[in-house]
């Protein structure tokens, strides 16, 4: 009995605060006055009401910095997605043609259809694929620890953590960070925009960003309180340390205006965008900076080689042997070289600066000229004889000592053509033939 009394006193002095029953006896009146707080007894009028937008497709697509970005929708079931798709179609038809709002609506429609396809497909068919904000995330099987999550900026431990990589922009992140991503895939920007910022570090100041990161809107300042502000040399904007890792990249504006290829610090988003744009021929140097050809001799040489290759192209298209040998495929990495002579990619400028492109293009030019002038009889038969001096050597429009008539494309020796620039024998012959065939056309 003495032991039981001690045990009771101990329990009364050491009550468990998490024990809803309590060690002490409750008065019956208290239990009646305070009914148990069960969820089933709560009045329906006390439940907060959540007002949804009128249209399903408007969920999460408002245009302020703190809303969900385009492509992230609250609609999660198939019925809501189908309704949102129909509403988006109707909006596209109602908006002005080729307007920015109509383009945004088309992008939203693409997002909705991709999400609907992801829900319709069985999980067993593509268990390793996740589609989010135009990212196509595939589950990685690498166990290496050399990767860093682009979202949380921590190491990815491949042995114990599941992680994904976007096939479009190489964005890597943990599986737990996928739903936290707010930045769309930059490949969509490359597809729609496909142009560079051509102003050198167009800084506007932290006040224009409301002292927040240009990407994630985290508060930043130059004094590193609460977070350090890092400037991107490409966009001129400021970013937090999670969005700016001090990556280095060549800035297109500095290369075009100053012929400067020194890598500068850029944000993660700018680095991925510049990497995707590196091989795209979007720079028309003669319009952006025509004086560059007066100061960079390598550019003049490359332009002459490209012009010669364009003159050789008709020979290869009509030559069976050249088509079988696939000579033009030697330029498959730079397809724009066989289409025009004035468009350049940033990779072209880098290779011109280092001297690699000049050597490569000279070798290809030599191979092409050898086929036309020596190896192929059909191509040799398409050569020209100078009608001004009547010498027997065969001329081609890409020869360095020749000139081409702008009207009839006849080829002459350069000296002969300039000495008789007032008259072209072939043009005169064609004009006389035309008058003979159409005598009624004469005045």
Curated annotation (Swiss-Prot):
Alphabetical UniProt keywords: Metal-binding, Repeat, Zinc, Zinc-finger
Region ranges (Disordered): 1-49
Any one GO biological process: lysosome localization
GO molecular function, one term: zinc ion binding
Domain of life: Eukaryota
Keyword Zinc-finger (UniProt): yes
Zinc finger (Phorbol-ester/DAG-type): 134-185, 364-424
CDD domains referenced in this protein's UniProt entry, alphabetically: C1_DEF8
Record's function text: Positively regulates lysosome peripheral distribution and ruffled border formation in osteoclasts. Involved in bone resorption.
Homology family: Belongs to the DEF8 family.
Protein name: Differentially expressed in FDCP 8 homolog A
């Amino acid at each position: 009995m003495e032991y039981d009394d001690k045990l009771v006193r101990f329990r009364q002095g050491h009550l468990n605060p998490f024990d809803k029953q309590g060690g002490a006896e409750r008065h019956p009146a208290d239990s009646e006055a305070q009914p148990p707080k069960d969820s089933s007894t709560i009045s329906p009028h006390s439940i907060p009401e959540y007002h949804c937008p009128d249209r399903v497709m408007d969920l999460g697509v408002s245009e302020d910095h703190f809303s969900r970005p385009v492509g992230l929708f609250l609609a999660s079931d198939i019925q809501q997605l189908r309704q949102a798709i129909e509403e988006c179609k109707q909006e596209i038809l109602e908006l002005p043609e080729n307007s920015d709002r109509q383009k945004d609506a088309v992008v939203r429609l693409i997002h909705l259809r991709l999400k609907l396809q992801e829900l319709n497909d069985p999980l067993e068919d593509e268990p390793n694929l996740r589609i989010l904000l135009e990212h196509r995330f595939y589950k990685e099987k690498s166990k290496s620890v050399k990767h860093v999550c682009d979202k949380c900026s921590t190491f990815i431990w491949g042995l114990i953590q599941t992680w994904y990589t976007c096939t479009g922009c190489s964005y890597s992140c943990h599986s737990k960070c996928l739903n936290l991503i707010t930045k769309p895939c930059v490949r969509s920007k490359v597809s729609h925009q496909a142009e560079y910022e051509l102003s050198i570090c167009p800084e506007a100041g932290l006040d224009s960003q409301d002292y927040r990161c240009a990407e994630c809107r985290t508060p930043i300042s130059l004094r590193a309180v609460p977070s350090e502000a890092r400037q991107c040399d490409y966009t001129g904007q400021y970013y937090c340390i999670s969005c700016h890792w001090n990556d280095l990249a060549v800035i297109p504006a500095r290369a075009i205006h100053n012929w400067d290829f020194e890598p500068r610090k850029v944000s993660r988003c700018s680095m991925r965008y510049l990497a995707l744009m590196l091989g795209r021929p979007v720079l028309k140097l003669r319009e952006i900076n025509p004086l560059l050809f007066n100061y960079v001799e390598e550019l003049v040489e490359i332009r002459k080689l490209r012009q010669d290759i364009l003159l050789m192209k008709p020979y290869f298209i009509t030559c069976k042997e050249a088509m079988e040998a696939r000579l033009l495929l030697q330029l498959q990495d730079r397809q724009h070289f066989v289409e025009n002579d004035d468009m350049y990619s940033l990779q072209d400028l880098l290779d011109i600066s280092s001297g690699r492109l000049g050597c490569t293009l000279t070798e290809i030019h030599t191979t092409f000229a050898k086929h036309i002038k020596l190896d192929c009889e059909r191509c040799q038969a398409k050569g020209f004889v100078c009608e001004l001096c009547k010498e027997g050597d065969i001329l081609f429009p890409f020869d360095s000592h020749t000139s081409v008539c702008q009207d009839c494309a006849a080829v002459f020796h350069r000296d002969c053509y300039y000495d008789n620039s007032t008259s072209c024998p072939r043009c005169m012959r064609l004009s006389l033939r035309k008058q003979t065939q159409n005598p009624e056309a004469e005045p």
